[in-house]
Amino acid sequence: MAPKRRRTTESEINQVTQNCSSRITRAGISSKKINNNSSPVVVFAHGAGAPSSSEWMIRWRNLLADALKAIEVVTFDYPYISKRKPPPKAEKLVEFHSDFVKKIASKYPKHPLILVGKSMGSRVSCMVAVENDIKASAVICLGYPLKGTKGAIRDEPLLQLSVPTMFVQGNKDGLCPLGSLEGVRKKMKALNTVYVVENGDHSFKIGKKNLEMAGITQEEAERLAVQAIATFVSQISK
């Protein structure tokens, strides 16, 4: 019998929402509201090893906000971050994540909801998107951790999805071998696609030699990935 999950309190969600809003305003991301109902609201979840205030998360929040013309890109921290504890199993983060998504979605009921996650955050985002009371338009997985610590393929949340899903993966990401991902994608019932960052690792970092050989910068490589995300979101919105 599965252990009973502790119910997330309203005060916990409100506190995280307030913290996120203050960070976003200081970063200049969501201070400008776009009066266009086609502009999505994006809830962006961090990975296991770094909070929403990490350089990578801030950079990608900016990229997503610009490329998707989002009315708001909201990041947050899972509770274990403030407690300085190691991350729990992804399943134990679903309730908090889901409650937070509902809180943000209620602010923008007429705008498409896009769930984005980095690594562990993408896995939890997929679990949240499966819930009946979450009406997401798409899920974007940035470095999906398909391979578990003991090598098991963790595809259960993906096979349950019915929401259009995009994977952005580095082909040197040991946590998500592209061959394994391709096999899972064929079994998924949801519309899905993948964008491969050539020579990118789990965080899409490309080695200096490979960048020189390709005649591209790291920034340009990441912008190409974000442009692909914007194209995907635009296509499913038609």
State each model region's role:
Residues V43-G47, G143, Q169:
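The conserved beta1-alpha1 loop
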Residues A48, N171-D173, N199-D201:
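Acidic beta-to-alpha connecting loop that harbors the catalytic carboxylate
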Residues G174-S180:
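Conserved alpha/beta-hydrolase "acid-adjacent" motif
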Residues N192-K238:
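C-terminal catalytic histidine-bearing segment of alpha/beta-hydrolase fold enzymes
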Residues D77, L142-G143, V197-E198:
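Alpha/beta-hydrolase-fold catalytic nucleophile elbow
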Residues V16, C20-I114, R123, F204-A214, ...:
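Serine-hydrolase catalytic machinery in alpha/beta-hydrolase-like enzymes
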Residues Q160-S162, F167-Q169, D173:
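Short beta-strand/loop motif that positions the catalytic acidic residue
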Residues H97-V163:
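Primarily recognizes the serine-hydrolase "nucleophile elbow" in alpha/beta-hydrolase
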